[in-house]
Swiss-Prot record:
<keyword id="KW-0720">Serine protease</keyword>
<keyword id="KW-0378">Hydrolase</keyword>
<dbReference type="InterPro" id="IPR001940">
    <property type="entry name" value="Peptidase_S1C"/>
</dbReference>
<dbReference type="Pfam" id="PF17815">
    <property type="entry name" value="PDZ_3"/>
</dbReference>
<feature type="active site" description="Charge relay system">
    <location>
        <position position="110"/>
    </location>
</feature>
<dbReference type="InterPro" id="IPR043504">
    <property type="entry name" value="Peptidase_S1_PA_chymotrypsin"/>
</dbReference>
<dbReference type="GO" id="GO:0005759">
    <property type="term" value="C:mitochondrial matrix"/>
</dbReference>
<comment type="similarity">
    <text>Belongs to the peptidase S1C family.</text>
</comment>
<protein>
    <recommendedName>
        <fullName>Putative protease Do-like 12, mitochondrial</fullName>
        <ecNumber>3.4.21.-</ecNumber>
    </recommendedName>
</protein>
<feature type="active site" description="Charge relay system">
    <location>
        <position position="144"/>
    </location>
</feature>
<dbReference type="Pfam" id="PF13180">
    <property type="entry name" value="PDZ_2"/>
</dbReference>
<dbReference type="InterPro" id="IPR036034">
    <property type="entry name" value="PDZ_sf"/>
</dbReference>
<dbReference type="InterPro" id="IPR001478">
    <property type="entry name" value="PDZ"/>
</dbReference>
<comment type="function">
    <text>Putative serine protease.</text>
</comment>
<dbReference type="GO" id="GO:0006508">
    <property type="term" value="P:proteolysis"/>
</dbReference>
<feature type="active site" description="Charge relay system">
    <location>
        <position position="222"/>
    </location>
</feature>
<feature type="transit peptide" description="Mitochondrion">
    <location>
        <begin position="1"/>
        <end position="24"/>
    </location>
</feature>
Length: 499
């Protein structure tokens, strides 16, 4: 059962200084005046009286913890990325944050983005109408976190820093605390943990560890803590789905790494990366092609970015077997590989063991900062540009793409629209919607050409190079035989049709 408890001001339907209660089949909401809640714990109410009594005995979030959650207000002037010399209208938006050790406030980078004279940030404590000026001390868009400083003894009086916990197990009950856009009331929403996985941080297009929770959340909750027991397990930063029922949380390992990096370095980048792309090696045919023994585990390198510390050391089609002596699983469990790398720091050296043409090699490689291929420009900073002869030259940034609604022009490509499950394609199920660029090293012109290349294969292995440098290898004769069986299984008359 989900519930949402809001504390801090009297409902507009209540004329007396009394709690007002709204109950529906799924959600129970309590709105209490601040005077009634100070020094008390938050309770929720259900139609079921027994359930209500049970909840009263074990309230979700202590009032002292709520005292440490603040509302964040940002006023900014945004620059146009298409015409970068122009400013757009002034914008005001907000979110949530909470106190951490060292008299600092932790929030999302997108809540206070920008570190220039055109950004003004203020914070307000729970139950207070006083806004205090805040300064962005540290910001990292790759993990969507920022640290604020407030130079006011009055603000910090009686406020305790919240403590961080560990990554929660699945189905753990959690509470989202923050200030949704619906009003100035602090709200507590109950939910459960539904997943822990590497995911996209949409604002920066980077991939780091995330926690997914089933809880109704809103934009103003961004930057607020997600709590279990008396510990913070993460910071809410994204919402998935039209019904706003799935919240995405930055977990404590990412938060701790950011805070430690902020204390140790003046640079914003704190997460390490090999700056390369890989794929799993579950399929027996591709394992045989790259001379992997049955007991060997590893992942195949598809592409190495020129900015990578592994550039000119590792090679495309190398198989990463281990990092610092820790085996890499063929299943490409991104939490164990990507998260392991990201928890190291830029310029830190790691020992990488690879399999190259059937032989093992080890190399020391320096990590680079986590950085997407397209530069993540702070949306409210003055963009870089150069004008000559009426041409405006700008770097391609994510904010430019967002402003311009940039789209690649349509071209005729051959893509894998579906993967029909069979032993022959085991391990390739996630290659759906990828473009086929080459067949056995020959660039694909169109669908007819792809058919000719496949049916004209004379080698033992059929190799398909896909977009994003993904590779697919099939035993040609086995694949031909499996094709007939798959067609018969799905009652498909022919493997080929043309307009």
């Amino acid at each position: 059962m989900l519930f949402r408890s809001c504390v801090g001001m009297v409902s507009r339907y209540s004329r007396a200084l009394l709690p007002t209660i709204t109950i529906s089949s799924r959600i129970a909401t309590i709105v209490l005046p601040f005077a009634l809640t100070r020094g008390r714990k938050i309770h929720t109410m259900s139609k079921d009286e027994e359930w209500w009594k049970k909840i009263r005995k074990s309230p979700p979030v202590d009032e002292l913890m709520l005292e440490s959650v603040v509302e964040v207000f940002t006023d900014s002037t945004k620059y146009s990325k298409v015409k970068p010399w122009q400013t757009l209208n002034q914008e005001s938006y907000g979110g949530s944050g909470f106190a951490i050790a060292g008299k600092k406030i932790l929030t999302n980078a997108h809540v206070v983005e920008g570190m220039n004279d055109h950004i003004f940030v203020h914070v307000k404590r729970h139950g207070s109408q006083v806004k205090y000026k805040a300064k962005v001390q540290k910001i990292a868009h790759e993990c969507d976190l920022a640290i604020l400083e407030i130079d006011s003894d009055e603000f910090w009086k009686g406020m305790n820093p919240l403590e961080f916990g560990d990554i929660p197990p699945l189905n753990e009950i959690v509470y989202v605390v923050g200030y949704p856009k619906a009003g100035e009331t602090i709200c507590v929403t109950k939910g459960v943990v539904t997943g822990v996985k590497t995911g996209n941080y949409l604002r920066s297009s980077t991939k780091l560890l995330t926690i997914h929770i089933d809880a109704t959340t809103y934009g103003g909750n961004s930057g607020g803590p997600v709590i279990t027991g008396d510990k913070v397990l993460g910071v809410l930063f994204q919402i998935l789905g039209d019904k706003k029922s799935t919240g995405v949380v930055i977990p404590t390992p990412i938060i701790r790494h950011f805070i430690t990096g902020a204390e140790e370095s003046s640079h914003n980048a704190v997460f390490g990366s090999l700056v390369l792309s890989c794929q799993s090696m579950k399929n027996a045919q591709i394992r045989n092609h790259f001379k992997m023994s049955p007991e060997t585990t590893g992942i195949l390198i598809n592409k190495i970015n020129s900015s990578s510390g592994a550039h000119k050391i590792l090679r495309k089609d190398d198989i990463i077997l281990a990092i610092d002596g820790v085996p890499v699983l063929s299943e490409m469990r991104r939490i164990s590989f990507n998260h392991f790398i990201s928890m190291k720091k830029p310029d830190e050296n790691i020992l990488v063991k690879v399999l190259r043409k059937g032989k093992e090699h080890e190399y020391n490689i320096s990590l680079k900062p986590v950085k997407p291929h397209i530069q993540v420009q702070q949306y409210y900073n003055l963009p870089s540009y150069y004008i000559f002869g009426g041409f405006v030259f700008v770097p391609l940034t994510k904010s430019y793409i967002d402003d311009k609604y940039y789209k690649i022009t349509d071209e005729q490509h051959v893509i894998i629209s579906q993967v029909m499950p069979d032993d022959i394609n085991k391990g390739y199920s996630n290659f759906k919607d990828l473009q086929v660029e080459k067949v056995n090293g020959v660039k694909v012109k169109n669908l007819k050409h792809l058919r000719e290349l496949i049916e004209g294969c004379f080698s033992k292995d059929l190799r398909l190079d896909l977009e994003n440098d993904k590779v697919m290898v099939l035993n040609y004769e086995s694949a031909k035989k499996a094709t007939f069986e798959i067609l018969e299984r799905h009652n498909i008359k022919s493997a080929w049709a043309s307009e």
